[in-house]
């Protein structure tokens, strides 16, 4: 099926993927490509519109990225965001200056933008109106440079107290640009602005739906794989489960899943995964006991990046061993999704700053004997869940909280040991049990922990991800008449719509107290429980 589509040119922003997510939520297909793709590619792509992303560079420096000139020659609408606005202004004859040179303040965080005039992009979109009747937007800013002089043909579309030109437009050519970030949830009308651009200005319809994606993905997998066999690393998490279902739908018994039990899974997860997949998917699954291998490689290693690399490499080596038992296995399938790729910032991502590597994309050796199949790498987590439901997977599987590929290896801070893993498994299970068993009440609404629409829902469903973390410290305690000196665990629960940004979950105190009491009383070796109240940013969701 041929889609109407938007081309997103990436200048290295860590939230470029969010632009794609918002566009797809508007049921418009889009793809992200590096800013320096060829003119031929852009001309042949057939985009209904082009979006220029943000980025960490400064257009005031001569060797930093620029948009291909063809972008402004195609005759299609263009939207510049943050750095995208700055490079648009500079390339079309405007003037951009650093905050220091302009004598202005940098803007990072919330800001109020005042709209100027009536443009196709912002007309009638506002969070509130000033006493003078000006439309006002609450937005998220993250910039040091600013446009100080407009290019010919442009008008000022918005401003802030610190940024005289916070948005600009050339309506005749349908060129628009905003200094703020409409793609992040902090910009309250961001979704409306992007929908206005793709639907109202670019003229795109709504032809991106998951049913169509399944048909296209199945066809693509069949063409890519042919009659060769595929081996997939199954963790029991959402991503690998949906990948398995999609690939199985495409090639059936050509797929063999390998479930690696490395001792770093959730409590009793190995048995549950085997039972679930035998009952629900009918997929061939081989269970591999690799606890000793993984623990041996991880012994003495405390650096989180090294742990991730070791775990990723060991996974691949296990798959290679198993693939030799499958005469026709030529492909290694993985449940890599967009957030994995953006946070790794490793492949096809020029100028981005690495946050951390993922085992799916950061630990693959160059001499890997298997070709790589990643059918979900262009999907966000919510799209993966939607795909799983469309494929017929049970809700309890699809809406299970995410679990990192390296497992508890990145939830045990410092050196990974079996003792720490066993303690953490039991503490984590208690936390999840209590979240499932506790439901939101009117009292929680009054405390501001949730909304009236959440009453009756379990706190497991009201949190996007929740887990325990084993800390590499001990604390003094008192149990009975005796002094204890035992380990500490941290509880982490977040609420997010995209896993790119997140807020810590305001769990009821009674729930937290109950979890803490159970862990300390039921898990010998733990005597203190703490709760993580950090958002993302500045923290990441996982501790390592």
Curated annotation (Swiss-Prot):
Recorded catalytic activity of this chain's protein: XMP + L-glutamine + ATP + H2O = GMP + L-glutamate + AMP + diphosphate + 2 H(+)
Pathway: Purine metabolism; GMP biosynthesis; GMP from XMP (L-Gln route): step 1/1
GO MF term list: ATP binding; GMP synthase activity
Binding site residues for ATP: 235-241
Keyword Ligase: yes
Pfam family, one: GATase
Coiled-coil portions: none
Main enzyme class: ligase
One Gene Ontology term, aspect cellular component: cytosol
Occurrences of domain GMPS ATP-PPase (ranges): 208-400
Record: active site: 82 (nucleophile), 181, 183
Domain named Glutamine amidotransferase type-1: residues: 5-207
Keyword Nucleotide-binding among UniProt keywords: yes
Protein keywords: ATP-binding, Glutamine amidotransferase, GMP biosynthesis, Ligase, Nucleotide-binding, Purine biosynthesis
Entry's EC annotation: 6.3.5.2
Annotated function: Catalyzes the synthesis of GMP from XMP.
Complex formation: Homodimer.
Name of the featured protein: GMP synthase [glutamine-hydrolyzing]
Organism: Dechloromonas aromatica (strain RCB)
